[in-house]
Design a protein with these regions (language model features):
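Short amphipathic alpha-helical segments, especially helix-boundary/capping motifs
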Residues: 23-29, 63-66, 98-102, 193-198, ...
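Cofactor-binding active-site loop characterized by glycine-rich and histidine/acidic residues
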Residues: 1-95, 116
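Long, well-ordered, tryptophan-enriched scaffold segments
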Residues: 106-269
Length: 269
């Protein structure tokens, strides 16, 4: 992205993780396009903007207010397993920071497991207990529209009841295999709700998560902008590797595309 914006020389694109090349995590001392915060140690990218906002509040109250600004962090769901994140959330100094927004990339995959569904319930409760404003962007506009049709309530209930491991496994299938696995054990009403869909349309529906839908994200961000008395966190449901051949594959962490896959992806773009 930085290269496309003209902020990074093309030569760096071929030197990822090399000595003198781009780091695997943002670094203010090593990257040529200095980021706002260095990360590397998991959890720092979440906590640093939060305490920066607290510092900004102190500066404004003691030395005069500056133009309004926002402090935004994009973090992974497995990053919420880090203890320093919750220390920052619970710190009294970070309360009532209405100019803070965290966006959690909730793809349910970490390096070595699929995140259990119960975790989102626990995390939401922890944020709310600390006084945060919480939004879940779970479904895209296609699924939301489908839920409003006949048997849509049953369809939504069926998807909501699925374990993360079960739902995650669907992304690796297409055609009749996807339909069979998706409807396995489902009430008859769920089958009726998708009966008229082609296999391709069913795949697009099942994978229509809110984190990939710009309209759903815009709506959530607008709500966060209106909440000015506390920090906000947005859980954006996504598919790891979305749009790529390894999308949703449990072994896709740091996976590389083959030459043929890159050529196909380039043609699709």
């Amino acid at each position: 992205i930085q290269y496309l914006l003209g902020n990074l020389d093309e030569s760096y694109l071929k030197r990822l993780r090399e000595f003198g090349g781009l780091q695997s995590y943002p670094s203010r001392t090593k990257d040529p396009d200095a980021p706002d915060f260095s990360t590397g140690s998991v959890g720092l990218g979440a906590a640093a903007p939060l305490f920066a906002a607290a510092t900004r509040r102190y500066v404004d109250s003691h030395f005069g207010e500056r133009p309004h600004s926002r402090f935004i962090a994009l973090i992974g769901d497995a990053e919420l397993d880090e203890g320093n994140v919750w220390e920052a959330v619970a710190d009294p100094a970070t309360a009532e920071l209405g100019n803070v927004m965290w966006v959690v990339d909730f793809n349910r995959q970490s390096l070595d497991r699929v995140i259990p569904g119960i975790r989102i319930v626990q995390w939401r409760a922890q944020f709310e207990a600390a006084g945060w404003h919480v939004i879940e962007v779970k479904y895209g506009k296609k699924l939301q529209a489908k839920f409003a049709e006949p048997f849509g309530e049953e369809l939504e209930a069926w998807i909501d009841a699925m374990a993360n491991e079960q739902y995650q496994s669907l992304f690796g299938f297409s055609g009749q295999e996807l339909r069979t696995r998706f409807l396995d054990g489902a009430p008859a009403e769920v089958g009726k709700s998708v009966a008229e869909l082609t296999d391709e349309a069913l795949y697009e529906l099942v994978t229509d998560l809110g984190g990939h839908n710009l309209d759903s994200l815009r709506d959530a961000f607008a709500v966060c902008d209106s909440v000015t008395d506390r920090p906000s966190v947005v859980f954006a449901y996504t598919i790891k590797g979305w749009g790529l051949p390894m999308a949703g594959n449990p072994r896709n962490h740091s996976a590389l595309l083959t030459g043929d896959q890159i050529d196909n992806f380039r043609n699709e773009l």
